[in-house]
C-alpha cells in the first residue's frame, strides 16, 4: 500500500471524534500523532489479519468502516469502492470523487510523469 496524503489534512481527519474512537478501538493512539498512527498501521498491515481500519486512513466514512467490522462484510446498504453501511448518497459522492482523482492520476502517469512529479514532496 502506498499512501499519498497531506499531513495536516490527515491529522485533522484522524482527530475527528468518530474516526479517533474507531482507531482507539483498533489499538491506535490518535493523540500520538500521524506518524505514530501510520507506524501502527504499517505494523498491522504486516500481520496475519487485514486491518480494516485502513479505510479510515483512505477517507472512508467511519460508519462504513464500523459497519463492515460489525457485520463482517454483510448487511450493507450499497457496494461501490467499499461496502456502505451509512449514508449511501454521501458514499456515492465520494466514489465519484475517488473516480475523478484516479482518472486524473492515470492521465498524468499516461503522460509519462512519475509519482514524484505528480506528488512533489514539500
Put a short name on every predicted segment:
Residues 6-7, 67, 87:
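Poly-acidic low-complexity segments
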